[in-house]
């Protein structure tokens, strides 16, 4: 599919990324139409996908996307949560139209409803979960590109990209590779330089883990608590106030109110 050109061949760096993201690991079951993409079957029953054919189909899919004059007529779809972030990032960098989450039935066939759309090309994450848009696309003759596992059905799919579509890292990497190849074919980025967008942006993030990471990052930004230094205060000498009162009493400094020399008679005669 790459036409035998070295410039379109699979690079060692991309192969390493695919192996790390487990893109080559399929499921234990094999659809009879996907047997041509299976390289080998392991002893534990897992089928190994031929990454050479994966890259050839990815380049073919990128050429089909670039052939559409208006990029917004290309719809990228993912009903599964693990592919929704990758779909949104792909649409951001390639100017395509994303549908992340639940697909509205009749969006391609029912012209009365407000959500009616007329795309020229579909790219779906999983034929099993995205069966509704694939079925509706077959009614109105819309070509479909799909990331398919070894057990995925290929009915109504025009270009199948064999890969592990059940792993969040594998799905994110495949959308990233497809976006990079589309931009290279358009001439937006060069093949000789590295694309500055990292693949981590396309990976699915668990909301709970994201909240924990944000909380930990916010905690690191907080200033450390102030530690008060110990201050040595001078110790005052204790005074025995009882001794001072006793000394004043002995010295005669206290008046005796019982020895009053003035006598007063409260009688009516006024005499003492």
Curated annotation (Swiss-Prot):
GO CC, alphabetical: cytosolic small ribosomal subunit; nucleus
Location(s), subcellular: Cytoplasm; Nucleus
GO MF term list: ribosome binding; structural constituent of ribosome
Entry-linked Pfam families: 40S_SA_C, Ribosomal_S2
Annotated spans, Disordered: 250-272
One GO term of the biological process aspect: ribosomal small subunit assembly
Predominant location: cytoplasm
Skewed-composition ranges (Polar residues): 263-272
SUPFAM superfamilies with a match to the protein in the record: Ribosomal protein S2 (SSF52313)
Source organism superkingdom: Eukaryota
Keywords: Cytoplasm, Developmental protein, Nucleus, Ribonucleoprotein, Ribosomal protein
Similarity-based family: Belongs to the universal ribosomal protein uS2 family.
Function: Required for the assembly and/or stability of the 40S ribosomal subunit. Required for the processing of the 20S rRNA-precursor to mature 18S rRNA in a late step of the maturation of 40S ribosomal subunits. Required during oogenesis and imaginal development.
Complex formation: Component of the small ribosomal subunit. Mature ribosomes consist of a small (40S) and a large (60S) subunit. The 40S subunit contains about 33 different proteins and 1 molecule of RNA (18S). The 60S subunit contains about 49 different proteins and 3 molecules of RNA (28S, 5.8S and 5S). Interacts with oho23B/rpS21.
Protein name as it appears in the record: Small ribosomal subunit protein uS2
């Amino acid at each position: 599919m790459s036409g035998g050109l070295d410039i379109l061949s699979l690079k060692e760096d991309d192969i390493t990324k695919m192996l790390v993201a487990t893109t080559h690991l399929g499921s234990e079951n094999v659809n009879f139409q996907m047997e041509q993409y299976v390289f080998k079957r392991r002893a534990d029953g897992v089928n190994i996908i031929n990454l050479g054919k994966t890259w050839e189909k990815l380049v073919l899919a990128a050429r089909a996307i670039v052939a559409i004059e208006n990029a917004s007529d290309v719809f990228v779809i993912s009903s599964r949560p693990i592919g929704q972030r990758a779909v949104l990032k792909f649409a951001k960098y390639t100017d395509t139209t994303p549908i992340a989450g639940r697909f509205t039935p009749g969006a391609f066939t029912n012209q009365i409803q407000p959500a009616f759309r007329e795309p020229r090309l579909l790219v779906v994450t999983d034929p099993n979960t995205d069966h509704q848009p694939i079925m509706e696309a077959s009614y109105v003759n819309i070509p479909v590109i799909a990331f398919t596992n070894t057990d995925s059905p290929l009915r109504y799919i025009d270009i199948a990209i064999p890969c592990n579509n059940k792993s969040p890292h594998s799905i994110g990497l495949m959308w990233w590779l497809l976006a990079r190849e589309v931009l290279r074919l358009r001439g937006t980025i060069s093949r000789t330089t590295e694309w500055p967008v990292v693949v981590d942006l396309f990976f699915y993030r668990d909301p709970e883990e994201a909240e924990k990471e944000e909380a930990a990052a916010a905690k690191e930004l907080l200033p450390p608590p102030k530690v008060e230094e110990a201050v040595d205060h001078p110790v005052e000498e204790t005074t025995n106030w009882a001794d001072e009162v006793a000394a004043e009493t002995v010295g005669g400094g206290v008046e005796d109110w019982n020895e009053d020399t003035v006598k007063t008679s409260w009688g009516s005669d006024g005499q003492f």
